[in-house]
UniProtKB/Swiss-Prot annotation:
Its main location: secreted. Glycans are attached at residues 25, 316. It comes from the Eukaryota. One of its GO terms (biological process) is lipid catabolic process. It is found in: Secreted. SUPFAM superfamilies: SGNH hydrolase (SSF52266). It is an enzyme of class 3 (hydrolase). This is GDSL esterase/lipase At1g59030. The active site is at residues 37, 324, 327. It comes from Arabidopsis thaliana. Residues 1-19 form the signal peptide. GO terms for molecular function: lipase activity. PROSITE patterns: LIPASE_GDSL_SER.
């Protein structure tokens, strides 16, 4: 009898442990992403914009070697995070005309390369503003309700991980068109306030687990070094990095306050320090080159300037932190995701 009781207890423990594991694996039904080229997996492909990359050598390290509209040699963080969450190896672009209803269930990215928190940024670049991405998100939820029911839509809204990634294009480009209205500090503050407003609006639509990326050290991307870093030294554009830091200094406490005010979880995700350390100490992370991109000569090549006619593209992109003159390589993205995701997800789930 004692043996039977012991066996029954062991079975119960096994079932409970297995259920807990199953629950943990199914906690996150989808990944929903908003933002710019860092997270764009092809939303710009059919837009009337010059900011496209659906041609070689973009995608040379993507599965099958296809150029999909991702601003990298391979996958981008939206893909890598989706994989790490156990959802899919790649995250589809919402604007993909071949997307089927079932493709929506594990999440999508609404991100559009070249956009920003400043509405002027998307207008200048002829891309999808973050505010229009919210409109697309409303449409997405309507589709989920129509095809899979109210309960599934509720599950996605309440339990999915929502990511917001923007600010680089505002800081690096649009500010130059806004100097008559803002100095550097006030513009960075305006962007941070816009980011908080965006998160508030996303929360109103039902999102409850939201992570917001900090600005990155955009003054250290190869293009900024080439144009503003000095002909011989090609150092980082420090005034631009200072603007990014000001944006972060404003954004972080504002999101903390919002997290206390609203139900759910709202996280500030510090990407700046990790990427800056990678750029300053590339060998520590297994990289050889940090001040040039792999594509072309790595100084100015981006979008159509990074093309298959350029004979200087490197053969080993994994040795480079940057793929083109503005965007990291897949391997650099992987390092960032591996360094940050578990740390921050533990605060959400």
């Amino acid at each position: 009898m004692k043996i039977q009781i012991l066996l029954f207890a062991l079975v119960l423990i096994f079932v409970e442990a297995n259920a807990a594991t199953q629950g943990k694996n199914t906690t996150i039904p989808a990944l929903i992403v908003f933002g710019d080229s860092i997270m764009d997996t092809g939303n710009n492909n059919n837009l009337p914009t010059l900011l496209k990359c659906n041609f070689p050598p973009y995608g040379k390290d993507y599965p099958g070697g296809f150029a999909t509209g991702r601003f990298s040699d391979g996958r981008v963080p939206s893909d890598l995070i989706a994989e790490k969450l156990g959802l899919a190896k790649t995250l589809p672009a919402y604007m993909n005309p071949y997307l089927k209803p079932e493709d929506l269930l594990k999440g999508v990215t609404f991100a559009s390369g070249g956009t920003g928190y400043d509405p002027l940024t998307a207008k200048i670049m002829s891309v999808i503003s973050v505010w229009d991405q919210l409109i697309n998100f409303k449409e997405y939820i309507s589709k989920i309700k129509r095809h899979f029911g109210e309960e599934k839509a509720k599950d996605i809204l309440e339990h999915s991980f929502f990511l917001v990634v923007s600010s680089s294009n505002d800081l690096a480009h649009t500010y130059l068109a806004q100097t008559h209205r803002y100095d550097r500090t006030s513009y960075a503050n305006f962007l941070a306030d816009s980011a908080v407003h965006f998160v508030r609006e996303l929360h109103k639509l039902g999102a409850r687990k939201i992570g917001v990326f900090s600005a990155v050290p955009v003054g250290c991307v190869p293009l900024q070094r080439t144009v503003f870093g000095g002909f011989f030294t090609r150092g980082c554009n420090q005034p631009l990095n200072n603007m990014a830091k000001q944006f972060n200094a404003r954004l972080s406490p504002a999101l903390d306050s919002l997290d206390k005010e609203l139900d759910g979880v709202i996280l500030y995700i510090n990407v700046y320090d990790t990427l800056f350390d990678m750029i300053q100490h590339p060998k520590k992370y297994g990289f050889e080159v940090a001040d040039r991109g792999c594509c072309g000569k790595g100084l100015l090549a981006i979008s159509y300037l990074c093309n298959s006619l350029n004979p200087f593209t490197c053969s080993n992109s994994s040795a480079y932190i940057f793929w083109d003159s503005y965007h990291p390589s897949e391997r650099a993205y992987q390092v960032i995701v591996d360094n940050l995701l578990d740390k921050y997800l533990s605060k959400v789930y």
